[in-house]
Amino acid sequence: TQGVKEITLLGQNVNAYFYEQKDETIDFVTLLEYISEVPGVERIKYTTSHPKEFSDRLIASYRTMDKLVDHVHLPVQSGSDKILESMKRGYTRIQYLKIIKDLKAARSSVSISSDFIVGFPGETEADFEETISLVDEVNFDGSFSFMYSPRPGTPAAALPDHVPLNVKKDRLARLQAKLSKNALHYNQLMVGNEYEVFVEGLSKKDSSKLSGRTSNNKVVNF
C-alpha cells in the first residue's frame, strides 16, 4: 500500500457493489472486509451510499469493523413519503429512520450527513414540513441542500404542479438555517474532546498550518 493509511471507495450507490465469479460472491461488506485486512490501512471511507441498498449486514459492520470511519453520508432528499415515491427513491421515511436508528445502535459515535432537494414537483408546504421534522428527528451533522430545477427529458420535468421559484427559495433558506443550526450544535458537543486527525495537506486558509479530518469528517486546521 506504499504508506497509504486511508482508502475511500467512491461511486454512485456505492453500497450496491456486487461482484460474482465462479466460486465466490463479493458484496459491498465483503469488499470492506478485504480492505480492512490490508496492512497499514487505518481508515476506510465510502461515498455515496443509497438507503435502498443499506443492508443490515452493512449496519452490523459498524459494530465489528473499527477501521470504518465514524461518518455516513446517506442522502434522504425528502422527509415526505409522497415526494419520495414521486422521486422513485425506493424507500419510505420510516425505513430511512430505521436505518439511522440501527446505525446509531451499532455505533453511537457515528455522524450522519445527507442530501436534500426542496421544491420537487408536487411538494406542498405540508410535505416540506415533513422534511423539517425529519431533520429535527435525525439531527444531521451537516448536509447538502438544493432547489429542484427541471432537466428536459427527465421524468420529473413532465410532472405537474411545479413549485414557484420564490417558494423554492424560501424553503431552501429555511431548511439550510435548520441544518446549519444542527451542525453547529454537533460541533459544539465536540469542544473539549480529543480526536485523531489524519493530515491531508496544508491548510487552505493558512499555509503555515496543516489540515486534516477527524474520523467523523470534521476538518481541523492546526
Language-model features, listed with the residues they occupy:
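Terminal RNA-binding accessory module
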Residues: A158-F222
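Glycine-rich phosphate-binding active-site loops on the catalytic face of alpha/beta enzymes
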Residues: F144-S149
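Contiguous mid-protein beta-loop-alpha structural module that forms a pocket-lining wall or clamp
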Residues: E123, V135-F140
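P-loop NTP-binding/switch modules centered on Walker-like glycine-rich loops
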Residues: I132
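Hydrophobic, well-ordered secondary-structure elements that form the walls
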Residues: L74, D115, V135, S143, ...
